[in-house]
Amino acid sequence: MTIDDYVVDVLMRDLVGHDKRPVAFLVYLWLAAEQTRRNGTVQISYQELAESIGVSKSAAQSAVGWLKRRKLLMVSKVAVTATPCYKVQRPWKR
């Protein structure tokens, strides 16, 4: 996986330093890598996501919410109780 310079030079400092949300950066990075591996959206539960990056389920949920607010992550579900599908956004590439 190739990481955009922006992710390391700007986004990491912004999420970890300014926003004080290091888990959000880990979630973003892991989902970006997984999206590349799967060649598309990532469908995964909060519990599986949390276990994949080594954090609590509530920390993963909070991070996903923060990334959605920052428009760095699109989340969709086919039903309210369905497992979410994630699509990493790269707004700096527009």
Question: What are the language-model segments listed below?
Answer:
Residues 57, 61-94:
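Winged-helix/helix-turn-helix nucleic-acid-interaction surface
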Residues 1-52, 81-82:
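Short recognition helix of helix-turn-helix/winged-helix DNA-binding domains
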